[in-house]
Amino acid sequence: MVTKKNSRSPWAWIPTLYFAEGLPNVIVTALSVVMYMQLGLTDAEVGLYTGWLALPWVIKPLWSPFIDLLKTKRWWVLTMQALIGAALAGIAFSLPTAFWFQATMCFFFLIAFCSATHDISADGFYMIELDEHTQTKFVGLRNTFYRLAIIFVNGFLVMLAGVLQVLFRNQIRFSWALIFYGLAGIFIGLWLYHSRFMPRPKDDVQTDRTVGEVAHELKNMFRTFFVKFGLGETVCVMLFLLLYRFPEALLNTMTKTFILRPNSQGGLGLSPQEYGFANGTVGLIGLLLGGILGGILVSRDGMKKWLWPLVCAITLPDVVYIYLSYSLNSNLIVV
């Protein structure tokens, strides 16, 4: 297997690169929720503060065109991985302090920004390093290792945090500090590995365009989009993109606190170990199977036929959570 410019096998760097891409995303959006809840924040505080952490991924298209103005994509990938590793260590160091909340929020924001930039650079590097045929061939591998990162954090690490809390007699901060020390070590290891094994494509060069030229191109792109489709169609497209996964987005953060809160506080009262198994392992397997089935149906009959059934399918979990909120059924098999 060869790339466009190098003889180095994509198997040497694609799995680890996309595992590294998935880790910080789920650490910031999922692991932080569980940690803050266990450290005493209310549901309202958890929802407010962790909700803001997703902002860098929302607005990353605004700075993605400017990445090539400074250094290469490979440089950005390695630099962001090093910064993420340092920020994870910063979270671990700051957890035992009196200002742990302010410090960890700053580090989580840094991780979110670095992760969004890493996504841009890693995807760009993938496209310039591999020819179109090889890109298509490795799409499945990319997605697999990205999902494995989600399983690792949502499944294994949450369960490990629960086990550590039992071993260290409910020392919650110390247990979470150990988790983040471990994550910092993993990311520093990934950074060192990629420094050695990521190829150096000849096409990965710093652009000679200026900031003004890139900003002008970005402005023209938005203008062309609105002129081509018209204001009415553009508004409809934007509303569709906003609302299609809106029910899922509403559930994303608060389901974690709902599952972990005790029955006396309106939750299901699962332990971190049970949560990790139910949500991070079994739930993700269901997500993968659903994605495969949806892909088969769409490829066979087209998106037009299955669009509204899929809209209903993505809203179905809301009904399940309504049932669980009324019944407060803590049976792990039911959950």
Language-model features: locations:
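Helix-to-loop junctions at the C-terminal end of transmembrane segments
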Residues: 58-72, 289-308
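C-terminal ends and interior cores of transmembrane alpha-helices
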Residues: 78-99, 312-333
